[in-house]
């Protein structure tokens, strides 16, 4: 336990703790030039992702906290691990994001978290952060935020209007694997927020059509100049009406963040004001699966990804080759580079591309008789 940490000490801990979430493509790389050129790469939280038009964008990638009530066997932040714990306040995340943005280090924020106290408490802290960013700091950059399985639907609904993308990690391919490695998590709890987000996006598309607002949902880019009036002080008169048992949370917002809108507990869960000015999760949702922690085949993995695309309208499924950070002898070990090969992860991404962009079915790429890709061959072969 380390007390009175500086914000930079927290950044070092919480950016490193976020590096195993591959929903953004790269992070944790530090490289200093030798004096013969210009430019240094810092490892603290800067990762690179790609927009729908192919641009590479830099994101501040951090956890709100690495404290966690769960004890997932594959996770470095599990409750039983003796690691230094740190927690950002919402204001600290906002300050870091704005300072990095002003210096042109980043174009947006990727915000995830360990589960502190409960899913609802964690989701509330994440929500406080993005409301502050959008309202108090008038931040118009890209925000990707995790939706926490087990959190209330109302919190996820509100968050969807403040962020560009949300993601819910599937974690492991099967319910049996979850029971074995993450017994506190269930498939139903993970799929429920995915369905909430999907339904919210569909409902919002209909709302936007009825109000004749032209939003290009495929790219997540607003073809009307929607950002011009999102964050003005008129938001203080907006009203978000919804049911939630934790009235103190919303009363807290009424007093501290009135610029972002007021919350009350009446009128059939309708959300007005901010939602009329911005679409719901405009860049869509994504998910992530760990590859190789259990014995699922590539065929099983691409079949699950195909189902997520078709049944939940996901924009991306990410694959993360398992790294045995806890050196658990009952799980695949990485010793001298052996273990789950990164090339397997790469082949899954290539197959995923064929499904997303060229309409291939999982059954056209693999079968139960031939369930795995040849790591030496591109799936197109």
Segments the model singles out, each with a brief description of its role:
Residues 62-91:
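Canonical Radical SAM [4Fe-4S] cluster-binding loop centered on the CxxxCxxC motif
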Residues 96-112, 351:
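Short Fe-S-cluster ligation motifs
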Residues 366-381:
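Conserved alpha/beta core segments of nucleic-acid transaction machinery
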Residues 1-67:
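Flexible, acidic/Gly-rich N-terminal and inter-domain linker regions that tether
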Residues 75, 108-111, 166-168, 317:
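Hydrophobic residues within beta-strands of alpha/beta enzymes
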Residues 117-354, 358:
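Conserved AdoMet/S-adenosylmethionine-binding subsite of the radical SAM
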Residues 77-83, 110-119, 143, 178:
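Short acidic, glycine/Ser/Thr-rich loop/turn "cap" segments at secondary-structure junctions
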């Amino acid at each position: 336990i380390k007390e009175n940490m500086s914000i930079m000490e927290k950044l070092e801990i919480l950016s490193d703790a976020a590096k195993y979430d591959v929903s953004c493509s790269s992070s944790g790389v530090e490289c200093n030039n030798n004096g013969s050129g210009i430019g240094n790469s810092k490892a603290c939280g800067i990762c690179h992702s790609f927009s729908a038009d192919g641009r590479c964008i830099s994101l501040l990638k951090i956890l709100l906290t690495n404290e966690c009530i769960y004890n997932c066997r594959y996770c470095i932040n599990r409750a039983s691990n003796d690691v230094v714990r740190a927690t950002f306040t919402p204001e600290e995340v906002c300050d870091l994001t704005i300072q990095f943005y002003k210096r042109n280090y980043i174009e947006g924020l990727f915000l995830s978290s360990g589960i502190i106290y409960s899913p609802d408490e964690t989701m509330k802290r994440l929500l406080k952060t993005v409301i502050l960013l959008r309202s108090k700091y008038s931040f118009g950059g890209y925000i990707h935020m995790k939706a926490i399985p087990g959190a209330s639907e109302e919190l996820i609904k509100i968050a969807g209007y403040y962020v560009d993308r949300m993601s819910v990690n599937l974690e492991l391919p099967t319910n049996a694997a979850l029971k074995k490695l993450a017994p506190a998590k269930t498939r139903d709890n993970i799929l429920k927020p995915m369905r909430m987000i999907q339904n919210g996006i569909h409902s919002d598309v209909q709302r936007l059509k009825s109000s004749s607002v032209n939003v290009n949902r495929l790219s997540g880019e607003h073809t009307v100049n929607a950002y011009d009036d999102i964050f003005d002080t008129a938001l203080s008169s907006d009203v978000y009406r919804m049911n939630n048992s934790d009235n103190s949370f919303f009363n807290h917002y009424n007093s501290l963040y009135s610029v972002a809108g007021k919350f009350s507990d009446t009128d059939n869960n309708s959300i007005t004001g901010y939602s009329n000015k911005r679409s719901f999760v405009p860049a869509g949702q994504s998910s992530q699966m760990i590859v190789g922690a259990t014995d699922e085949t590539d065929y099983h993995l691409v079949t699950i990804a195909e189902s997520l695309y078709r049944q939940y309208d996901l924009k991306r499924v990410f694959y993360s080759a398992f790294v045995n950070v806890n050196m658990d002898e009952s799980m695949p070990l990485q010793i001298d580079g052996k273990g789950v090969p990164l090339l397997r992860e790469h082949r899954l991404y290539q197959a995923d591309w064929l499904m997303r962009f060229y309409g291939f079915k999982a059954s056209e790429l693999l079968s139960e008789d031939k369930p795995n890709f040849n790591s030496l061959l591109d799936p197109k072969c």
